[in-house]
Design a protein with these regions (language model features):
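Long, contiguous hydrophobic alpha-helical segments, chiefly transmembrane helices and signal peptides
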Residues: 28-29, 47, 112-115, 144
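Solvent-exposed, acidic/flexible segments
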Residues: 5-8, 29-32, 103, 120, ...
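Charged, low-complexity, helix-prone segments enriched in Lys/Glu/Asp/Gln
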Residues: 47, 104-109, 165-174
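C-terminal lobe and pocket-closing loops
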Residues: 57-135
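Ligand-binding pocket segment of bilobal, Venus flytrap-like solute-binding proteins
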Residues: 1-89, 93
């Protein structure tokens, strides 16, 4: 893992607690790239990374089937990985699914564009309209395509719903998630 509090340690802890896995977390790798290199060297048996990163940096592994993708850390299956379950699908209890969904919600919000609180509604609407227009701009989309990055934008309204769902998570779900993540 890349350190306490990082997804590379959080997800395995949550899966150990709620899906019955027995991952041994090895801390101290400075980045997910270092974790992948450790796997390549045989220092560790697995690592957490994004599908996009795996496709861009380890294409040979995928082509040669040198790697097994065990689970997806998201709420829905990625279109290119229809046969790989999500963490929510393998959680053994409704409490486990709730804790994982809460944790995933925070990760999904991690890449949001935000404005300060109290911004007048008309400005929020204007910013959202400008953002939505950018998402339809041919030059912008061409740059995204050229970068090779996956791009799955969410509208301001979708992000607002995710924020509301995450912020209104029941206290017992928040506490269960915190307790599990803090456990040794």
């Amino acid at each position: 893992g890349t350190g306490a509090g990082s997804p590379s340690e959080g997800y395995p802890k949550l899966l150990n607690a709620f899906a019955g896995t027995k991952f041994k977390i090895i801390s101290g790798y400075p980045s997910s790239t270092a974790g992948m290199l450790a796997m390549e060297r045989g220092e560790v048996d697995g690592a957490l990374t994004s599908w996009n990163t795996l496709k861009r940096t380890k294409q040979q592994w995928l082509q040669n089937r040198d790697i097994n993708v065990l689970v997806q850390y998201g709420t829905e299956r990625h279109p290119e990985m229809r046969d790989i379950p999500t963490v929510l699908e393998i959680a053994g209890t409704s409490e486990g699914r709730a804790a994982l969904a809460f944790y995933i919600g925070g990760a999904q919000l991690g890449r949001s564009l935000v404005a300060p609180p109290g911004l007048p509604a008309e400005r929020v609407k204007m910013l959202r309209s400008a953002f939505d227009a950018m998402l339809k701009d041919r030059d912008f989309l061409a740059e995204i395509d050229k970068s090779g990055q996956e791009f799955y934008p969410a509208s301001g309204e979708q992000v607002q719903k995710l924020i509301a769902a995450t912020a209104s998570a029941p206290r017992n779900v928040v506490e269960l998630t915190e307790t599990t993540l803090r456990a040794k």
